[in-house]
Amino acid sequence: MAELHPRTGKLISLSNGNRTAARKQPAQEFNQGLVVSARPLGPGEVFTVRLDRKMNSWSGSMEIGLTTQDPAFLDFPSSATGLKGGSWIVSGCSVLEDGRSVLEEYGQDLDQLGEGDRVGVQRSISGELHLWVNGRDCGAASCGIPPRVWAVVDLYGKCTQITVLSCQPPPEEEEEEDAEEQEGSLVPLGQSRPDKFPNSLDTDSGFPSTELSAVVSNAILSAYHGSLLSVSLGSPPAAIEHSPPTCNDALLFHEKCGTLIKLSNGNKTAERRRPLDEFNNGVVMTNRPLRDCEMFEIRIDKLVDKWSGSIEIGVTTHNPNSLEYPATMTNLRSGTIMMSGCGILTNGKGTRREYCEFSLDELQEGDHIGLTRKSSGALHFYINGMDQGVASCQTPPVVYGVVDLYGMAVKVTIVHNHNHADRLRRNNAILRARSPDTGRHSSSTPEPGQLLFHSNCGQKASIINGGRTALRPHATDDFNHGVVLSNRPLQNNEVFQVRIDKMVDKWAGSIEIGVTTHNPAYLQLPSTMTNLRSGTWMMTGNGVMHNGTTILDEYGHNLDRLKAGDTVGVVRREDGTLNFFVNGIAQGVAAWNVPPNVFAVVDLYGQAAQATIMDESDALPLPGDEDEGLALTPGTPCALLSLSDLRFHHLHGANALITNGGRTVLRKNSRSEFNDAIVMSSRPLRDGEMFEIVIQKMVDRWSGSIEAGVTAIRPEDLEFPNTMTDIDYDTWMLSGTAIMQDGNTLRNNYGCDLDSLGAGSRIGMMKTIRGDLHYFINGEDQGVACTGLPMGRDIYAVIDLYGQCVQVSLTGGSGLVDNSLSASHVTDKSLPSQSPVPSVSHRFHTVCGKNVSVLCDGTRAERGAGCSHGIVFSSRELLTNETFEIRVEKIEPHWSGSCNIGVTSLSPHEVSLLGGGLPERALELRSKVTWLVCGSEVTRNGQRLRENYCNSLERVRVGSRLGVRRDSDDTLHILMNGEDMGPAACGIPKAVYAVLDIHGCITALSTVSSSLLEEPDATKPPSITSESEEEEDPADHGDPHTVIQAHSLQFLANHGKNILLSHGNRTATRVSSYNQGIVVLPQPLPRLFLFQIRIDQLSPHWTSSLSIGVIAVSPERLNFPATAAALKRSSWIFQRSAVLCNGVKIREGYGPNLDLCPEGTCLGLLLDSSGGLHLYVNGLDQGVGAQDLPEVCYVLVDLYGQCEQVSIVTGEAQGAELDAHEGQLPGEREKADMVDGVKESLCWVPPDPVALLSCEYLALCTRFKDLLLLPDGYFLEDSKLCVCHCDSCHKLRGDETYRKRGDPPREYAEPIGWCSFPLRLSPRSSCAQYKKWHIAYQGSSAGTIRRTLDRGDLLPGSACILTSVPAKSDPQSGFPAAEPNVLPPRDLQSVVLSPTLRYAALPEMCPKVMFRDPRSQRMFGAQVALQVCVRPGSYKTGPPSACAIDLMDPRIPSSEMEFLTKEKGATVLRGLLVRVE
């Protein structure tokens, strides 16, 4: 009897004698459902399972295949596609080998199976993988399968339960019976499952189907608009009956198409020509009729904004070969069904006006549209993979797919079922991310009750806010009797933390906190807890008391100095130690041998009037939360990390969707709905409390944007209107620049304009104690908006996600500005806290070693006592190519050893399931696979894999950075101070966490990297293109300044946050990080005026460098993004060797690469009279980079990456002419070295400093030269004499492409694309001897270059690539040795040279060799050649003999392409040339 192996995925439960497998929590989890056969399959055996149960809330379904991995030793991945080391999986209708797709469109689409269907997998006797569906063989899916394999089934997505039926060879006559059944009347395969994708998504929990459907569809649609995922439905198998006689050709566009259509990409892509001039004549059809149930799906690649209307798609019975294509398909009056907008047109007439809720006119680039004709004749359309239902019930059997590229639609591509599994996983990830309550608690064990205050409290204390807040209502009348205890005992390692809400300035002393063994239900509470004489430990002031007696005098932070907004906490560790925290910072061990089951206690004594319990959701976001507003930089003071308990109220407008635990709100259907998205705060605002949100997403479809304000109406009493300005009572709103009360405008031109704010901007509202309403933009007070808010009434914050604003999140606010209960006095305890700065950083998980304290919102980890128990994890799984990087913050040198870093497949949530918790060292993590770098070794589960992998980690110091990354090829990489140490291990699964062991001398770490999912593109590290959004309305400009004083030029005081101005604002320095370094000029750039800056300082710690350009918006109102590339409106930027317009690259290969400019380089900008923008490099005009610029433009410089300081030099050197005379231009040399006006250095004079660049190509060529193991004695010692002739360096020096040299002068080509390494001249020769010789090149090879250098000359008969007669040499002199008594050979072969490398470097004469770069570990191809001096008159010229004429150099005559010489001493080696591809 066939059975399943008892070892399974972690969410699988087995029953029925290990024959039935079910996925636990199927509504919350869609993976972790792997099962494997109990034994290897025998020859020809079919392992058959039945699909018992499905759940339609996920995408994807069962996956099945074979694996060579023994389940007894297998580390089960989250899904079958994660199996490595010999696995073959059928997913959907794709076949994957070790996770990589090897076959598309195979057999039956497993995603379309229904309950009761049978699926089998077989390894045939010949080693082929066969899939069987309902007893029918789908054919060979793969070959070369080893004989010992196990069957594997993944209960993924919709599939929640299966049962094993059998494991035996198929009957011999089964194939014949199948053939007979196909000819007869066979019941269709899909009879047991619905023909239509279910529109209802009802769940067992009673969630309304319409609401859930809307949530899911909008979430997926939003994800598509954000290009987060793309889902392509697999093609179901062709129906057996009634299918038209079609061929098996791939589905492509027909060659005959509309008059303006251009086909490309193998007829898979269609594009309309002249899209800005014509809007129709863009009809394309498929090359063959569609099969039944075949998906015809296209992706929108390009849209234009000029026209109304957009793409139309459908089917037609007309054969494209005989059809005369109309201007639009809606003109056809027969045999045509088209979807246009959101309706259906049949033969040009509307048959269904509202077919679906999505309009084709609203789709964006990257969206998918598909259609399929079912075997029943029903026509279905799909938008981004979602079935829109039946569009037509009686579709003819033979139809062609047709697309009309009309109006805005310009370019589409047919897409097939590529990356099927990845699309489904991204789809499911979006589904779960958009349902915040789904899958948060995967453990089946119930959590302990919420930690609250007990109702039994001190005589003068009261418990409010559902047990979370304790206060002394009459704090100015009495200073004690304010003791409150927790409602249950603390668990081990459970932190009890409270925030001080209110204080009074009347008394001395303040809050006290601690633990007690007394149960609050039976305790007669004293006036202060220090009066208890048993079972009590309290922190008071800056001391610790036990049973009323002081045991520590000077301990930690003085609690009497705390102010409102500060936090204090206490925790009992497993080892019985007691630790206190102040503002999240551990104060160290306060007591030992504290018994378990102690209650937390807070004494609201003296000045402390109110405190609130801070739960985990207040301090740390849940794993996977993507709330940019809650992320804080590692440098943020811990005192600022006490986030507010404010949330969005659960009652809201119809189009609002609350996610992220009430901290994020988004508007559904953002491109079809612009209002009905009002949200309110979850509770009333306190006086002086700021309610602050950050804008996270905007669309450019609507006019108007976010509106914000306050109301005295309770959410329960409000019938939410379309917009909040419709309310005519008790409401105050800011809309644009207008302040409105009860729907009427109070004042215009308020200090800020909400319509001009873009993504990343923060908006705050605060009601003062006097009843004034203030607004804050990015933390800056905009002044009083209105006065007279009602005193004594509850005031709620209101946000209206209107128009362009789609999504916002809470930042946590700024706390209370005035918390004093005395209205006439303001003390230092009521000073406002600063607003947290929105930023996105990686975090450590709260689950950690028992000696570790995770602080500062999870961005810092410190080890307390001892040298072990210091394991910490990343807060979530690492994404592919995501770097988790930390910085060493503290070292204690009296310990030996250092930290370890790596990855583990052990989830922090599973630590509680380990017996005894986390071990002392990360090397002992063996329950799941763990890879670590310890010292310089790489280990796997404690077993050594590699030695001497990198520099020893024991050498790290304070400030050192360590990073870990899992690459897309499943390799583990370690980074030290930003440098990749190369692959450390391979075969790393997807679901891994970063793990570190804070061991030995390392005692504190902090995260310095950022999340790939959460991070805005504009803040990514250098060398990554930034594409973040920048929303900025153009401002009114004054008249341009036609005359400008050069000496008065200075940078504007409004600049990037990392910029420091000096020297009269003429010098800008970036003082930290690699971005946020934008500076601008306050004056517009006049026409024909050359503005210049000089690069003063570069840092080798970063990649990439400065950008320079102009903007057409007023710099006074510019919200500076992180990089210049993030400016999306009215900007023209020179970056690297490209030109960007509004963040989009419009030109490549312009001028030199700015990333390679050294210190001292002068860069300039000039606007010509016709509006053309010119870039100047060291006074050299690089030509027009952009045209038709507006009249008013402001200069912008971005100090990015390597560039740390620039200075304005326009006042020091007026114009390009003066600048050219101040310093020698690149390539400039003495007049005596000039021949026919072309400059040339003859004796290896050191090149211009501009050429001495840190060029990556030169470094790569140098590494290859080192691999040749050539003696250093052959080369000049000074490495600065090596010259790179790559395109960037060549342009930067201003070198000519061709030069003339010798007497008489002869032209030769520069070695562009090569690197030159100068060779030593023979001691017998002089430099001046060869000044009048000509220059030529000879191709060589990596295997013969050493012999040529040993000989020292290209003699006739030397062992070069073009000659074959051997010759002897004298190794001592390095020159040929004459052979006594031997006559020279009569027939010497000529040495063949050429004045151009286009000929000398042909593969026949200069073969390419492959090598692995020791630094990047990538494979490259390399060529070597020699540059030689040739004596005039010693050679003959001739036509090429090695290739056709059309491959020659256009400047070198073909009759002079070869130099042939047989004379001894006619050539001298000048340099070794290397080219790498």
Swiss-Prot record:
Keywords: Cytoplasm, Cytoskeleton, Repeat, Ubl conjugation, Ubl conjugation pathway. Ubiquitinated. This ubiquitination leads to proteasomal degradation. InterPro entries: B30.2/SPRY_sf (IPR043136), ConA-like_dom_sf (IPR013320), Neuralized (IPR037962), NHR_dom (IPR006573). It comes from Xenopus tropicalis. It is found in: Cytoplasm, Cytoskeleton, Microtubule organizing center, Centrosome, Centriole. Promotes CCP110 ubiquitination and proteasome-dependent degradation. By counteracting accumulation of CP110, maintains normal centriolar homeostasis and preventing formation of ectopic microtubular organizing centers. The gene is neurl4. Residues 1-167, 250-417, 450-616, 645-813, 841-1010, 1048-1211 form the NHR domain. Residues 1-26, 168-196, 1012-1041 are annotated as: Disordered. Its main location: cytoplasm. Pfam families: Neuralized. Residues 171-183 have a biased composition (Acidic residues). This is Neuralized-like protein 4. GO terms for cellular component: centriole; cytoplasm. The keyword Lyase does not apply. CDD domains: SPRY_NHR_like (cd12887).
